[in-house]
Amino acid sequence: MKPVLLTLVVVTIVCLDLGYTRICLKQEPFQPETTTTCPEGEDACYNLFWSDHSEIKIEMGCGCPKTEPYTNLYCCKIDSCNK
């Protein structure tokens, strides 16, 4: 009986992932860098660079957004990988 119960516990842990969420660096233009826990379903981090002709701007966060022309986007799926 104990081996069956142990097997059920292990299967539950593996299948449910026990609430694991992605942690990404977050930064809006002209704001300090922080970390954020991504919402459920978002398993990627992004780093977006663009220029407005006077300076280079950087934005970081959760997800992998669609980009506009003349932007550089890097997406990754490891905690805090978007440095």
Curated annotation (Swiss-Prot):
InterPro entries: Snake_3FTx, Snake_toxin-like_sf, Snake_toxin_con_site, Toxin_cobra-type. Belongs to the three-finger toxin family. Short-chain subfamily. Type I alpha-neurotoxin sub-subfamily. This is Weak toxin DE-1 homolog 1. The keyword Aminoacyl-tRNA synthetase does not apply. One of its GO terms (cellular component) is extracellular region. Expressed by the venom gland. Keywords: Acetylcholine receptor inhibiting toxin, Disulfide bond, Ion channel impairing toxin, Neurotoxin, Postsynaptic neurotoxin, Secreted, Signal, Toxin. Disulfide bonds join C24-C45, C38-C62, C64-C75, C76-C81. PROSITE patterns: SNAKE_TOXIN. Residues 1-21 form the signal peptide. It is found in: Secreted. The keyword Coiled coil does not apply. It comes from Ophiophagus hannah (King cobra). It comes from the Eukaryota. One of its GO terms (molecular function) is toxin activity. Binds to muscle nicotinic acetylcholine receptor (nAChR) and inhibit acetylcholine from binding to the receptor, thereby impairing neuromuscular transmission.
